[in-house]
Amino acid sequence: MTMTRLFITDVTLRDGMHAIGHRYDRGQVREIAAALDEAGVDAIEVGHGDGLNGSSLAYGFSRHSDLSYIHEAASVTRRAKLACVLLPGIGTIEDLKRARDSGIELVRIATHCTEADVSAQHISAAVELGFHVSGFLMMSSATTPENIGVQAAKMESYGAQCVYIADSAGNLTPAGTTARFQALEAALDGATQRGIHAHENLSLSVANTVVAVENGARRVDAALAGMGAGAGNCPIEAFIAVANKYGWEHGCELFKLQDAAEDLVRPLQDRPVRVDRQTLTLGYAGVYSSFLRHAERAANEFDIDVREIILEIGRRELIGGQEDMIIDVALDLAAHQSAQSPNRTG
């Protein structure tokens, strides 16, 4: 297969924030960023799991500010570019300016997969500020491939130089991934790049990333030991091993990625980042991966099987930004459970 070199973005220091409650310390950020830079990744994404300015009661407070994390990563990177995510309505154009001044060169403007229109102002502003700008269609499994093409074309028209399919729920199959990249091929100009951001909830992140590359993706998101929301992202060390077997060109060193994953990242996981009964249910139900910790807390508080909460979230089609409604789901399920209990007294 003849193709251009893959551009690998590691998201351990952004999506990986979800896996540890946004609690990296400064030293961990320096260590991980330095190891990634040494291992040859093209870009390192840094910041709160929900993007610039995401630290809040609703999404979870970071141990340190986004700018602090960016400064730490910038202090040790010599080759890799630094990247961030911004969700309109959470991050602002002023946040973009501060991120640029702190060393960020690439920004991904992320919206729900049916709401690309809300990215117009932020994409155009980011282009004017000199960033390489990507549109990021979150929860791409939650709409049709045809609509993905429509939404991607909107982002392109606002100035995005790349559009990512983000399988935030880890719900896509290889066939579903193929269909969405075929839709991008039909909708986008040939000069607009395509990217893939996969999650592991159905154990398909590497397979879906491979299929995406075979269908035109040249920008690939992955994380050390899969560090990310839910069952995690596409594990970078596994994907690079597969890319080597395919003969695809990239700049990464496999053993250095393996060492960073095992020595630096896995020891930080207070909850193993893996496919288990909870994270598998996220993928099965098509639920936003970063809802996992919120659902687990609600399940503990109300003594409900977290899988029931996740399934109900899926039925209600909650999307990112509706984390506060998870408690409502748990309350409703607890009330129903109480009403069905044979030991109920009154």
From Swiss-Prot:
Keyword check for Manganese: yes
Residue numbers marked as site, Transition state stabilizer: 14
Domain called Pyruvate carboxyltransferase: residue spans: 6-258
Cross-referenced PROSITE patterns: PYR_CT
Gene3D superfamilies, per database record: 1.10.8.60, Aldolase class I
Pfam families cross-referenced by the UniProt entry: DmpG_comm, HMGL-like
EC category name: lyase
Record bears the keyword Transmembrane helix: no
Name this protein carries in UniProt: 4-hydroxy-2-oxovalerate aldolase 1
Organism: Mycolicibacterium smegmatis (strain ATCC 700084 / mc(2)155) (Mycobacterium smegmatis)
